[in-house]
A protein has these predicted regions:
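Helix-centric, low-specificity signal for extended rod-like, repetitive segments
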Residues: 11, 98, 319, 553-554
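C-terminal outer-membrane/trafficking sorting elements
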Residues: 484-494, 498-565
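Compositionally biased non-globular segments, especially hydrophobic aliphatic-rich helices
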Residues: 11-14, 19-23, 44, 94, ...
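A detector of low-complexity, intrinsically disordered, Ser/Thr/Gly/Pro/Ala-rich segments
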Residues: 6, 18, 62, 126-127, ...
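Bacterial Sec-dependent N-terminal signal peptides
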Residues: 1-27, 480, 503, 523, ...
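A sequence-level/structural motif corresponding to short, flexible coil/turn segments enriched
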Residues: 22-481
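N-terminal cationic leader/targeting segments used for protein routing and processing
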Residues: 4-5, 84, 103, 109, ...
């Protein structure tokens, strides 16, 4: 089990020799698709000559785009797009409304696919699977749930035995839902390839919520359930403290709980809505790489390099989240824990291991600073709606390069929703965007935007964006210092609170230690570099309030709160 005492792996600060750079990502081909309303794509599967993309169409787009749907309500659609030149081939509509719908290929039946999401049955919104053929004909559908329905959708998975796992957050038992512990609990079902229910499972406690965010296949035939949860009282998910945790649950193939682990913040600032969430698992030979997001620098994130920020830059607003990656050993003890992002919200989508032991990470960002240096080429304003973000790290979590992708200028509104890996260098990426008026802006160069055929139509509705990228970075030219030996991150900081100076005493002498004092607006108000074991910072002229003190050298990387009285 994971050690209760927190240890963090203390990375070297890569100063002038830091090897981050705007990535040499080449977009080989791309195209946009949609109508005059929002057409949101969520998932993609690959066949030999084409892709199938699944998404959701708003009523305003019905009858105006590539896919012609009937009715005046949201519709789920599937688009068939050629692989060679990204031409729209055909598409089909289905009378279900499902955010985050997933499409999976049935590996046991050529030309058949599963659409997995939600649909109104039992008089409420519940978990649904539709089986379709290669012509878009519905073969069958099944629905699981109860008359109360679910509140939020969860993770979906095509399993190694050809079945489907679907999940959502439920508040009431009944129907297919065997038990609810309290609040919002995560409920999962597994059915076979013919739609027959094999098992159902509730994950939760008496806390307000336990949400299933993702479900992944384990190499032993079982499953990983990625969650965000509070935890207390009766239930089968218990975490050490009552706070928002990133929790991973390991299930057997039969849906039985084998173990669960909780990670996250120490809840040192509950008024700032400190929280963490589990998103992704990569199995390694010597452990795991876990992925999620978090908005703190305490608990399991102490020394992780979280980038301070508040929502909309409000002085008293909730903290913003970074992408959080942490490597653990086979006993799930943390080896290193690192954050990536800037002072706004950053979100993880998917992580792939590369042949050299490193990782390529796909996500989305609203940040324009910190690790997100490449945002400058898109030139977004502070109220931007986000861009896609890709970055590469080595096996020790050192950032090698990063790249934002999207249209340029103003509010932006680009997101990555699914990725197909072809090899370490090539990926097909699915996303959504507001197509630029000319079809070309920033990284976007589309000839198929719906607005191009109707210049008078407002340019604020979303199309979906399909593009193929190649990583052209020469990794033989990149080197980073070896990681230091793991030790506990500690430093004595006093007096705290203080009304004039704050002293720092390190555990060991160091040649160059950097200190930065940051106010609650994210501004560096004092800094100093010193050699030796101790030094101090002057705070007498600073306004009263809370500050963050960052201390970094070759052995120590930590952040502490300092109160100026």
């Amino acid at each position: 089990m994971r050690n209760n005492r927190l240890y963090t792996l203390l990375a070297l600060l890569l100063m002038a020799g830091r090897v981050t750079m705007q990535a040499q990502i080449r977009i080989d081909k791309q195209q946009c698709f949609g109508g005059y309303g929002d057409d949101i794509a969520y998932s993609i599967v690959e066949e030999e000559d084409f892709f199938l993309v699944a998404g959701l169409m708003e009523p305003s787009s019905i009858g105006t785009g590539h896919i012609q749907c009937d009715g005046n309500h949201q519709r789920t659609w599937v688009a068939k797009i050629s692989k060679d030149n990204y031409e729209f081939m055909e598409g089909w509509c289905f009378d279900i409304m499902s955010l985050f719908v997933k499409i999976f290929k049935d590996e046991n039946a050529d030309g058949e696919y599963f659409l997995v999401g939600q649909w109104d049955c039992y008089g409420a919104r519940n978990l649904t699977t539709i089986k379709i053929d290669s012509d878009g004909n519905e073969l069958w559908r099944v629905c699981f749930g109860n008359e109360y329905g679910h509140i939020y959708e969860g993770g979906r998975l095509y399993t190694s035995d050809g079945g489907i796992i679907n999940s959502g957050d439920y508040t009431d038992a009944g129907g297919d839902v065997g038990h609810i512990f309290g609040g919002y609990d995560g409920w999962l079902i597994k059915h076979d390839r013919n739609g027959n229910l094999e098992w159902e499972l509730t994950l939760g406690s008496q806390a307000l919520y336990e949400s299933v965010l993702n479900v992944q296949q384990a190499s032993d035939g079982g499953y990983y359930v990625c969650m965000q949860n509070e935890s207390y009282g009766e239930g089968n998910i218990r975490c050490p403290e009552i706070l928002s945790n990133a929790t991973l649950v390991k299930l057997s193939q039969a849906g039985e709980i084998e173990w669960h682990e909780c990670y996250g913040c120490a809840n040192t600032a509950p008024e700032r809505d400190e929280n963490s969430a589990f998103i992704d698992v990569v199995e390694l030979n010597d452990g795991y790489l876990f992925g999620g997001q978090a908005n703190c620098n305490s608990g399991d994130l102490e020394g992780s390099g979280w980038h301070y920020g508040t929502l909309h830059n409000s002085p008293n607003g909730p903290y913003t989240s970074d992408i959080w990656l942490w490597k653990v050993d086979n006993n799930r003890n943390i080896i290193w824990s690192k954050c990536y992002g800037g002072s706004d919200n950053d979100f993880l989508l998917k992580t792939f291991q590369t042949e050299d032991g490193g990782f390529i990470v796909f996500g989305n960002t609203h940040s324009r600073n910190g690790d997100v240096a490449s945002a400058s080429h898109i030139n977004l304003d502070e109220w931007n709606e986000g861009e896609g973000w890709i970055f590469r790290i080595d096996a020790n979590g050192n950032l090698l390069w990063e790249r934002c992708l999207g249209s340029a200028g103003g509010a932006g509104s680009t997101s990555i929703t699914d990725v197909i890996k072809h090899n370490d260098r090539e990926y097909t990426v699915l996303g959504n965007l507001i197509c630029p008026p000319s079809g070309s802006s920033g990284d976007v160069n589309c000839t198929n935007c719906a607005q191009l055929s109707n210049p008078e139509f407002p340019h604020h509705l979303k199309d979906y964006w399909l593009f193929h990228i190649t990583d052209t970075v020469d990794y033989s030219t990149i080197s980073v210092p070896e990681m230091p030996v793991q030790q506990e991150a500690s430093a004595e900081i006093y007096p705290n609170p203080t009304n004039n100076t704050v002293c720092v005493v390190l555990p060991n002498d160091a040649e160059a230690t950097e200190m930065e004092l940051i106010n609650m607006n994210g501004q560096v108000v004092a800094n100093k570099t010193f050699s030796g074991k101790s030094s101090w910072l002057e705070m007498a002229d600073l306004p009263k309030g809370m500050y963050m003190l960052k201390i970094r050298n070759a052995e120590v990387c930590l952040t502490r709160k300092v109160l100026r009285e």
